[in-house]
Amino acid sequence: MAPPVRPGMLPLLLLLLLPPLGSVPGVWSFSELFFMKEPQDATVTRKDPVVLDCQAHGEGPIKVTWLKNGAKLSENKRIQVLSNGSLYISEVEGRRGEQSDEGFYQCLAVNKYGAILSQKAHLTLSTISAFEVHPVSTEVHEGGVARFSCKISSTPPAVITWEFNRTALPTTMDRVTALPSGVLQIYDVGPEDAGNYRCVAATIAHKRKSMEASLTIVAANETRSFYMPTIIASPQNVTASLHQTVVLECMATGYPRPIISWSRLDHKSIDVFNTRVLGNGNLIISDVKLQHAGVYVCRATTPGTRNFTVAMATLTVLAPPSFVEWPESLTRPRAGTARFVCQAEGIPSPKMSWLKNGRRIHSNGRIKMYNSKLVINQIIPEDDAIYQCMAENSQGSVLSRARLTVVMSEDRPSAPYNVHAETMSSSAILLAWERPLYNSDKVIAYSVHYMKAEGLNNEEYQVVLGNDTTHYIIDDLEPDSNYTFYIVAYMPLGASQMSDHVTQNTLEDVPLRPPEISLTSRSPTDILVSWLPIPAKYRRGQVVLYRLSFRLSTENAIQVVELPGTVHEYLLEGLKPDSVYLVRITAATRVGLGESSVWTSHRTPKATSVKAPKSPELHLEPLNCTTISVRWLQDTEDPAAIRGYKLFYKEEGQQEHGPIFLDTGDLLYTLSGLDPRRKYHVRLLAYNNMEEGYQADQTVSTPGCVSVRDRMVPPPPPPHHLYAKANTSSSIFLHWRRPAFTTAQVINYTIRCNPVGLQNASLVLYLQTSETHMLVQGLEPNTKYEFAVRLHVDQLSSPWSPVVYHSTLPEAPTGPPVGVKVTLIEDDTALVSWKPPDGPETVVTRYTILYASRKAWIAGEWQVLHREGAITMALLENLVAGNVYIVKISASNEVGEGPFSNSVELAVLPKDASESNQRPKRLDSSNAKVYSGYYHLDQKSMTGIAVGVGIALTCILICVLILIYRSKARKSSASKTAQSGTQPLSQASASVAAGSDMGKNLERATETAESLVPMMPSSFIDAKGGTDLIINSYGPIIKNNTKKKWLFFQDTKKIKVEQTQRRFTQAVCFYQPGTTVLISDEDSPGSPGQTASFPRPFGATALDTEHSANSEGSHETGDSGRFSHESNDEIHLSSVISSTPPTSNPLAGGDSDGDAAPKKHGDPAQPLPAEQTSAPQTSAGLRYAAEGFPV
C-alpha cells in the first residue's frame, strides 16, 4: 500500500508532475510572450459599448496595439485601449458612408523578444432583413396536415414564433410543431384550426412580422380510402457550424397515417445523446460535431405494411482550424538554416500563412514557404524574432508561435566591404569585394548570394568560394535583368554579417524566340499579319524592330518589310488571289536580330468568291501543357451564309490533322492530347453550300508541364544508394540512383567531393553529369574523401544526398627499398635487410627479393622470395660456396610494383680458403662494384659465442634436473598421503597430555608433506587493511617473518625439526569453542563406524571450488576463496590435512554443491553450520590436480 500524501505536499506533487510550460507544444515560458486572453467574436446593437479582450503576458514592458482589417487602429474619444490591453468602444457605430466599426479586430503585443498577433475577432452589428419567404395560404382536408413556412436573414439568427389570428400560437399541443428554421406543422387539423397565421422574427434589437396566410379546412369524406404515404416536406441539405443546432424536417401524409423513421445512409448509428425527434418525425441534432456529418434518410411507412417512401438530405459540418502539429522554437547560428513546420485541419481546409513579429511573410529570396513549412536560409541577426503560423477558414482563425534565436559568435569577422559589380555580358557579372577589416585572417570561405531584384518569389542562389579570392564572375544570368548581390564571410565559429547589397543589370541579348503570328485575309489580294509581343523571359531586352518576310510558295524571291517594335500587325496588299504565300517574322533588340520563325503558309481567297464567308477572328490560348483553347468570332456584317466551320492543326514540322467539322453555333473548341513545349499551327475557316470561306491562321506554343516561376514547388528528393569504389590511386568511381518518387525529367546531377576534414572551402570540387555514375579523377593517393550528390529538375535542386566516405588506393611505390645489406651468417646462408622506400605516403604491402648466382643471372634465372610489408629482412639459404650472388629488392602494393634497388653482390668463399682471405669484398646498393653487408666473424668472436652457448646449456640442464627431482618427490608424497587419508578425521577432544602422540602423528605427516610446499606467493589479499592477524578455518595464523628459501638451498633435517615443533604447537591449540578441529584418525575418540560419517573438510567442497557456500572468507576479505594462508607453515598444514583425494570420501558424490550430508545438531561428530563457525572456511575453495594435490 502506498504511503498517504500529506495535504501540504499535494500542491508540490502536482507542480512536480506537471510538464514544464515550455515543453508543451505552442506554450512558452513566461519570460517570453504569449496571450492569456484573445479577442472573441461579438455582435452588438448600434450605440452599445463593447470590450474586446486582449491580455498578453511575458517579460515587460509589453506594448499592445490594435489592428482593424489588417490596418493599425487609431485611438480617439470613442475608441480606447485599456491598461490591460483590451479594446473599449463606448458607442459602436453602424455604416455611415465608408465608416463603420464592423470588421475583424486583432491585437498586437510587443516586448523585447518580438511581437505576436492575436486571432481575429469579428465585430458585427445586430441586423435583420425583410422576409425572404412569407407564409402561403392553403386548404387542407379535415384530419389532414397543414404546413406554413417563412424565412428571414438576421445577425444574430432570429428567434421565430407564430401567431394565430394575431395572438401567440401555443406550441404545447402535440399536433402543433414549430421548427426553429421557421416552419409550422399542424397535424390532424380540424375546423378550429381555420384562421390566419403569420410568423414573428425577433433579435436582440429588432422584430419583424410576416404577411398573414389563411388556413381553410375542407370537410372530409365520411369514408376515407387507403392511399400511399407521401412526403410533402422532405429534409433539405444543411451546412452547419460546429456546436450549432440542426433540424432536418420530414413531413408525410397518407392513410393510415404513416410512421416516420430516420437512419444514416452509411449505416452508422445515430447519436442518441445529442439527437431527438421533434414533433411527428422531425430530427433535431443539438451541439453538432464532426461525427454527425453524413447523409440522413427519412422513411415514411404505412403501419402494418411494407409500403414506404424515403427522402434524403446531407448534413455538412464546418469546423474552425485546429493545429495537429505546432512549430517549435529553434536556436540557430548565423548563416544557418531554420525550418518551422505547422499543420492544421478544419472544414473547409484552412489556408496557412506565416507571420514574423506580427507581420505577414512573403516568400522571396532567403525565406521560402512550402505548403505548411517555413524555411529560412542564410540566417542573419535580423531573423531573430517570433514567428507565428496562422490557419484560417470561414469558421475562424488560430495561431501558433515559435521563436528563432540567432546565436552570435563574439570573434566573428566583420562583413566584407566595398562590394561592387561590373557587367561583363548579357549573362555574366563580375563581383569584387574587400576582405573584412576585423578577423580577416580567420576567414576560411566566402559565399556569394544573388537573386533577381524585381518581382516576388525570386529564388536566391549561393556560390561558395575559397578564402584566397576576392572576386568572382557570376554567369548563367538572364539578359537585361537586374540582380542584387551580397557577400558573407565564414570562419570556423560562424559567419559574418551580410555585406552591403549592390544591384547590377545584365546587358541585352537577341530575342530567344520569334513572335507567334496570325494570318487572315480580308480580300483575295491581301493578308493581315498580326502577332503578340514576345514574353519578357524570351525577349531578353527591348524589341526595337520587326522584320517581316513573305514570298510565294512557287518562287524564291523574298520580300522584306521592316516595322518598328511598337507595331504588332501589318497588312500585306497587292497579292495574287488563290495563291499560297509563305510568311515569317523576326524580332530584333538593340544587340541584333534573333531567330526567325518558320515559314507559315496561307492561301489567299479566290477572286470570284463573292459569297464566300469572311475569315473568323481567331484566338488561341494554352490552357495547360497539353491543351489549347481555340476561340473565334464571326463578323456579324458578313452577308454570306455559313453552314459550319473547318478546323485544322499541326505540330511544327509534322503532318496536318483535320478537318474537324464544327457547327455554326460553335465558337469554342479545345485541342487536347498535345505535347508540352511544342509549337502548333492552327487554321480555321467557315464554309457554306457553295464554297469555303477565308481562312485564319495562327501559331501558338504549349508551355511546360511544371511551371516553377509561377508557383512554388517543393524541391525533389535527393538521389539515394550512393556507392563509391576506389578505381586507382587518383580516381574513385561513383554510382547512385535517382529518387524513386520523382517523375520529372532529370536535367543533371552535381557531385560534391572534398577530402575529409577539409578546412579550405576553395578545395571543394563540384562536378556535373547527366548520368547516374561518374569517375572522379585527379584525387590524391591514399586519401579519404567524402562525396554527396544532388539532382537538378526544371530549375529546382534537391538537397544533398547522405555523405559517403571512401579512400583512394595508395600510389604504387615510386622508389626502391633503401639501405639494402647482405650478411653471410653461415657457410650457405645469408641475411638480407633493407629499409622501406623513401616517402611518408608510400604504402608497401609486399617485398620481392630476387637473387641468383652470376651464372644464373647471365642465364636470366632468378630465385624469388616474397615478404610482407611489415618485414624488412629475409634469409637466403642453400647458397653454393665459391659463387658470387646478386641480390635486388622491390616494394609493391595492390596498385602496382615499384622499381628494383641497385644490385648487391655477395661472395660466398670456398671452405678451404685461408683465414686471411675470409673477409669478402663489400657492395651496397649505392655502389654496385663494392661488396656490402658482409660482416667478418674472426676467432675471438667465435669463442665468445661458444662460451655463451655453453653457459645457456648448463643452466637448462640444471633446471631439468631440479624438475625431475621435484616430480619424483610429489609422486612419493601422493602415495603416502593416499594411505593415511583413508581413515577419516574426527573432532579434537584430546588434552595437552596426549600431545606426545599427536606430535608423532604430526611429525609423520610433516615428513610426508614437506615436499609439497608450493613455490608460489601468498594469495591472501587484505582488501580492507588492518592488523597482521589472519584467521582461517583452523584458527589464528601466526605470521612467519623468517626469510623464505627454496628447498634445495635449505637444511632438510633442520626444517623437519622446526616444522614438527611448530605443527605440534598449533595442533595443541586447535580446539576453540564453536570451531571445527581436524585431527588424524589414530587419535579420534569416535568409533570406526562414526568416523565414516564425518565430512571431510576439503573432500566434498573440492567439487565446487568457485561457488562453495562455505567459502565465506572470500566475501569478507575480497579474496577469491581459494587461498587464504599467509606463510609456508600454513600451506604445509593445509597440505597435510587435505592431502586425501576427494574421491576417498563416500559422501563426496552425494551432494553436487559440495556440502556434507545433513546430521542432527546434537551429534558430536557433526561440524557446526557455516553461520556458527567463528572463522570463515576460506580453504574450502582449494582445487586439486589430477594427482590429488591442491592447486
UniProtKB/Swiss-Prot annotation:
Spans annotated as Disordered: 975-1010, 1079-1191
Alphabetized PROSITE patterns for the sequence: FN3, IG_LIKE
Sequence ranges assigned to domain Ig-like in this UniProt record: 24-124, 126-216, 229-316, 321-405
Transmembrane segments: 944-964
PANTHER family with a match to the protein in the record: PROTEIN SIDEKICK (PTHR44170), PROTOGENIN (PTHR44170:SF47)
Cystine pairings recorded for this chain: C54-C107, C150-C199, C250-C298, C342-C389
CDD domains assigned: FN3, Ig
Subcellular location: Membrane
Keyword line: Developmental protein, Disulfide bond, Glycoprotein, Immunoglobulin domain, Membrane, Repeat, Signal, Transmembrane, Transmembrane helix
Residue ranges occupied by any Fibronectin type-III domain in the UniProt entry: 415-509, 511-607, 612-711, 718-811, 816-911
Name assigned to this protein: Protogenin
Biased composition, class Basic and acidic residues, residue ranges: 1104-1132
GO cellular component: plasma membrane
Pfam name, any one: I-set
Protein family (similarity comment): Belongs to the immunoglobulin superfamily. DCC family.
